[in-house]
């Protein structure tokens, strides 16, 4: 089975002249890249290449990294705009009932009556709560608050989100 890679950061720009890269992390609280997992770089031209992080250091709201074989500013500049992806199996294990956003993307969203409402396009974090952005066939997307009032269960393994109600959503 092929490894599944999950985007965790973008290469914002080179840093200095020795090939260091400044990453814009999708989750600033995550320390996943500090553990130097294997990474896959998805380049702006659509190609991808595997890479190895050899050094990291947090700075401001970003992370500076050195990647094996990237030894000067020109080589670093060639990676500007690349997406940094990490194998899903490198993520920390979760407790019962917890899931990572990447694990529910594409999941079927079922109405309380058992009908298919749509599929999860993404998970957005807002100050008051997280919401599932649900893409519906032939209709506008909707945002479903990820609260017990609206979502009765999330089965990331089976890729099913069961809604408790449609009231206020459609």
Swiss-Prot record:
Compartment annotation: Cytoplasm
Pfam families, per the entry: PRC_RimM (PF24986), RimM (PF01782)
Residues annotated as domain PRC barrel: 96-169
Record note on domains: The PRC barrel domain binds ribosomal protein uS19.
Quaternary assembly: Binds ribosomal protein uS19.
Family: Belongs to the RimM family.
Name of this protein: Ribosome maturation factor RimM
Organism: Sorangium cellulosum (strain So ce56) (Polyangium cellulosum (strain So ce56))
Gene for this chain: rimM
């Amino acid at each position: 089975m092929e490894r599944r890679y999950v985007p965790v950061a973008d290469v914002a720009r080179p840093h200095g002249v020795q090939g260091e890269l400044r990453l814009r992390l999708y989750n600033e609280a995550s320390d996943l890249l500090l553990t130097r997992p294997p990474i896959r770089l998805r380049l702006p031209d659509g190609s991808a290449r595997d890479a190895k992080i050899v050094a990291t250091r947090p700075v401001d709201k970003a992370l500076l990294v050195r990647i094996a074989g990237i030894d000067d500013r020109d080589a670093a500049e060639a990676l500007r705009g690349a997406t940094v992806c990490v194998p899903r199996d490198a993520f920390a294990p979760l407790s019962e009932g917890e899931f990572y956003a990447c694990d529910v993307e594409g999941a079927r969203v079922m109405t309380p009556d058992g009908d298919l409402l749509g599929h999860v396009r993404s998970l957005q974090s807002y100050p008051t709560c997280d919401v599932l952005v649900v893409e519906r066939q032939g209709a506008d997307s909707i945002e479903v608050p990820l609260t017990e009032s609206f979502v009765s269960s999330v089965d990331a393994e089976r890729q099913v989100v069961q809604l408790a109600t449609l009231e206020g959503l459609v």
